[in-house]
């Protein structure tokens, strides 16, 4: 009788440290690396993939031992560390910082280690928070309810409040402004 080698899959809940209602649940094989987890977190939270350093920490960001910098292209001293070599147990927590300048911090909690014969595409985002949508302020003035998908940074800086707009209104009224996509 042939035995099937079981693969370990690590299930993490990753939340923005200062907006914990924004979270993603991510599964990754133990044989994959912190570089792979970094890329999935960047994709899940709409962080850019081509710029900015990141790093995982055993405790609080900047106050505890870091696991090595990860460069956007996947290099760096922390990028090749395998998930299954970290000695993690269910409930363990790390912190992750994306962009050392803007200091966007995340809480990374290991929820479960699963033994799996067949492993789906990994890494993968398996769930996320229920979105609490905001609406486009231009459309609201016209009596329409359109979900805002962009923050006009230029207008927000001028008015000292978030100026939230949908895709259409961004193109019509803010096309030459710097804007950032919203995260729900």
Language-model segment annotations:
Residues 1-184:
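Short linear regulatory motifs enriched in tryptophan with gly/pro/ser
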């Amino acid at each position: 009788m042939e035995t099937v080698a079981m693969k370990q899959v690590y299930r993490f809940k990753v939340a923005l440290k200062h907006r914990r209602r924004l979270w993603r649940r991510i599964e990754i094989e133990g044989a994959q690396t912190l570089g792979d987890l970094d890329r999935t977190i960047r994709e899940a939270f709409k962080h850019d993939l081509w710029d900015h350093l990141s790093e995982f920490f055993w405790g609080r960001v900047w106050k505890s031992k870091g696991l090595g910098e990860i460069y956007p292209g996947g290099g760096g001293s922390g990028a090749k560390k395998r998930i299954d070599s970290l000695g993690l147990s269910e409930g363990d927590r790390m912190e992750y910082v994306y962009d050392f300048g803007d200091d966007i911090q995340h809480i990374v909690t290991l929820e479960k280690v699963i033994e799996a014969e067949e492993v789906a595409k990994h890494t993968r985002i398996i769930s996320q928070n229920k979105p609490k949508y905001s609406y486009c302020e231009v459309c609201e003035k016209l009596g329409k309810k359109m979900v805002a998908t962009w923050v006009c940074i230029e207008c927000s800086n001028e008015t000292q409040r978030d100026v939230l707009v949908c895709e259409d209104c961004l193109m019509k009224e803010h096309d030459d402004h710097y804007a950032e996509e919203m995260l729900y």
